[in-house]
Amino acid sequence: MKLLFYDLETTGTMYWRNGIHQLSGMVVINGEVKETFDFKVQPNPKAEITAEALAVAGVTVEQIKAYPAMWGVYKQFTDMLSKYVDKFDKQDKFYLCGYNITQFDNHFLRAWFVQNSDNYFGSWFWSNSIDVMVLATQYLLPIRPA
């Protein structure tokens, strides 16, 4: 099983308005960590940057504007993915894994692919993700008060 655990830091909470400034995680294949990554990236030049989001991440506008350009980081990221997945094979994809990714991170990551002129996000990743927040629901149901 091919898993891509990941987390993003963004310039706000709206994927259509804000951008990514950090992409971190690990590639796990059949239970073995193959690679870790921590990409700092300049947000899309059109992205709005909110003070609240920068405070959460502990960075400044000046810092994120000094990060490597979006296109170059996108290329590094997809080069890494291509070491483990053949994007032309419909049966060879990663499961995206993380916390609250179905409601937040996946939208930003997909938008980032489009911003880099790549409409083939689904060639890399299965449409269903492994979201720890969603999985925890079944465990927490009998524990939490009704």
Predicted segments, located by residue:
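Conserved non-catalytic scaffold segment of RNase H-like nuclease domains
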Residues: M1-W112, S123
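Short, surface-exposed basic-aromatic patches at helix termini and helix-loop junctions that form
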Residues: F113-S117
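Short, acidic/small-residue loops that bind anionic groups at enzyme active sites
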Residues: N119-V132
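Short alpha-helix plus adjacent loop in nuclease-associated cores
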Residues: S129-P145
